[in-house]
UniProtKB/Swiss-Prot annotation:
PANTHER family: CYCLINS (PTHR10177). GO terms for cellular component: cyclin-dependent protein kinase holoenzyme complex; cytoplasm; nucleus. This is Cyclin-D6-1. SUPFAM superfamilies: Cyclin-like. It comes from Oryza sativa subsp. japonica.
Length: 320
């Protein structure tokens, strides 16, 4: 762990003046939002190594415990953003857990306090979230760790997460929706799935756009039923989604929380997210053609149900 190299002068991070919206990470409207998101997600896609996976599991477990402590009332999106910070930190720094077995917990606490400030949530007391622990970190140590997290993130605290892509996929595939209430239900269910599946370390292997598409497809299989028969093909055929990664992400999601869409056969595009930078100007017309094709595809087996809460976890989260 690089704690010995931390900044000598601790900068106390205050809450942001404006609440950070995970579904709209930009501070000002973007002229071409999908191109901006795809450009930014490359800087916000963590990749947790096998060596760091144990530390990640411990940090995720601590965040989950805090999230479901009824007395603390931590918002699910605060926990989501906190674990995103953990992933992004671990993708750039190492924790010497053998020498400092408490390091993952300190990282989790610091990421929780940072996320609460970004979300303008009620202040999270470091003492409260450490209640019942064998030993407690003091405020100075937590603030030093906050500073190290911010340095690792290069102060890009407005994370681009899968939640930022949900609205785009829905508007691109359904520019003139006939069932807005059902689409709202699909989005709400996709958000729930993303919050619950996030602690699965394999989810960090997928870009935010792919994770968002997979969650929407899984949600469509649960919520929409026969009312939107072309939804699976419409999302899967977006020209900037890698079909193989989409399938793999769906499998991870199915294994993690018991929900899985049967839409793999509909994922016909092999282009990568980067391709959209050359296509985004025609994305609207392309999505309309995709929706027409998708409406003709009868996905009769796309209604696998979620089998309940996840088995062992439940954390339910671009700068200029």
């Amino acid at each position: 762990m690089d704690m010995a190299t931390g900044a000598k002068e601790v900068v106390v991070v205050e809450a942001y003046e404006y609440e950070f919206d995970l579904e709209n990470p930009f501070t000002s409207p973007a002229d071409e939002p999908i191109a901006s998101l795809l450009d930014a997600e490359g800087h916000h896609s963590p990749s947790v190594s096998a060596a760091a996976s144990a530390a990640r599991r411990e940090a995720a477990g601590f965040i989950s415990k805090v999230r479901y402590d009824g007395e603390l009332d931590v918002h699910p999106r605060v926990a989501y953003l906190a674990l995103n910070y953990v992933d992004r930190y671990l993708s750039k720094r190492q924790l010497a857990c053998e020498r400092n077995p408490w390091a993952p917990r300190l990282l989790a606490i610091s990421c929780l306090t940072l996320a609460a400030k970004m979300q303008r949530a009620a202040a999270i007391s470091a003492a409260d979230i450490q209640r019942g622990e064998e030993f407690m970190f003091d405020e100075a140590k937590i603030q030093r760790m906050e500073q190290m997290v911010l340095n690792a993130l290069e102060w890009r605290t407005r994370s681009v997460t899968p939640l930022a892509f949900l609205g785009f996929f829905l508007s691109a595939c359904f520019p003139q929706p006939r069932h807005p209430a059902l689409l709202d239900a699909i989005k709400a269910r996709a958000v729930d799935l993303l919050l619950r599946v996030q602690p699965e370390v394999k989810m960090a292997e997928f870009s935010p756009s792919v994770a968002a598409a997979a969650a929407l497809l899984a949600a469509a299989g649960e919520v929409a039923g026969a009312h939107l028969l072309g939804f699976e093909a419409g999302v899967a055929a977006c020209p900037f989604v890698n079909s193989e990664k989409l399938r793999e992400c769906g499998e991870v999601m199915a294994a993690a929380c018991g929900v899985g869409p049967s839409w793999a056969a509909a994922a016909t595009s092999a282009e990568t997210p980067v391709t959209v930078l050359g296509h985004h100007r025609s994305a609207s017309s392309e999505s309309e053609r995709t929706t027409t094709v998708g409406s003709a595809a009868n996905s009769a087996d796309a209604k696998r149900r979620c089998m309940g809460p996840p088995r062992q976890w439940g954390v339910g989260g671009p700068d200029e």
